[in-house]
Design a protein with these regions (language model features):
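Phosphate/nucleotide-binding beta-alpha loop and adjacent structural elements of enzyme active sites
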Residues: 1-279
């Protein structure tokens, strides 16, 4: 039996059980494994996106970089983190990544020194103070060096296209205001965004979306949903922004004819089973 005939036979047999089979690198397979940051990055890769430089602003202990590196192993990685507590972990990580470097500083709209509120849990540390009362959430202020992303690009000689990730607890727009020149050569931006005004003078989801729209970027994907302990309301999420007229938005239709046919078939089978149970 020819291979093509065998494949058709296997697919036909699976469809009888309302099952489908896909290549691991197909668009459909990617869509079925989208949980977490790596899922977002794999989907971006499947679209043909290949960043020359990955900017990880607010690297913490290196979680994002460690997930991103296997997806884009040929990219240059530049990690920026102001907390010295993370330095040992970041040093170990960058030593294992052949094209990575870490700079211990905060990113802001201006160069100089800034006051960083070092939280007891470290991960929530921010240039902004939280509005929460009757807790020690804001921790202890610490003076740290601040640089702009544009100056970082110039100093390191980094080249685009860029993938920019920013997780800085409320200071995202400050970081972006210091990255105006770099944004011109950036295709994909991943921001952690809050749905509430957790930080004094900090932006919420709507503020960030409007700012990004004014810079020519729109929402493309989401991940990392977090819920606040207070009432279990959705509180923060990771939002991927892409150029409104760029690589990721060249097509605005929903599916190919083959994909639409396969989806219709699955829906019809599901409805037939549902109707059969109600007879």
């Amino acid at each position: 039996m020819e291979l093509a005939s065998l494949k058709r036979g296997i697919r036909a047999m699976l469809r009888r059980f309302n099952l489908e089979i896909y290549r691991l690198d197909s668009a459909t397979a990617v869509s079925l494994s989208r949980s977490g940051i790596e899922g977002l990055l794999r989907q971006a890769q499947s679209m043909g996106f290949v960043p020359t430089t990955v900017m990880d602003i607010g690297a913490a202990y290196g979680s994002f970089a460690s997930q991103c590196f296997p997806v884009f192993p040929k990219a240059q990685f530049i990690l920026l983190e102001p907390l010295v507590e993370y330095q040992p972990a970041l040093r170990k990580l960058t030593e294992a990544m052949s094209t990575a470097q870490c700079i211990m500083a905060a990113a802001s709209a201006h160069q100089g020194e800034v006051s960083l509120n070092v939280h007891p849990d470290l991960v929530g540390s921010s240039l902004f103070r939280e509005v929460e009362k009757d807790t020690n959430v804001n921790g202890v202020p610490r003076t740290v060096c601040a640089i702009t992303v544009d100056s970082l690009v110039k100093e390191t000689g980094a080249r685009g296209p860029f993938l920019l990730k920013v997780d800085v607890q409320g200071a995202e727009l400050d970081v972006l205001r210091g990255a105006e020149r770099m944004l011109a050569d950036t295709e994909y931006i991943l921001l952690e965004v809050s749905l509430f005004k957790f930080f004094q003078d900090g932006p919420d989801f709507n503020d960030v979306v409007l700012y990004m729209k004014s810079r020519g970027f729109v929402i493309y994907d989401i991940s990392g949903l977090q819920y606040r302990p207070l009432d279990n309301a959705l509180s923060q999420l990771d939002v991927a922004f892409v150029r409104e007229d760029g690589l990721f938005r060249r097509r605005h239709y929903y599916a190919t004819s083959e994909q639409r046919e396969a989806q219709n078939r699955r829906i019809r089978i599901h409805l037939e089973e549902l109707f059969a149970r109600t007879r």
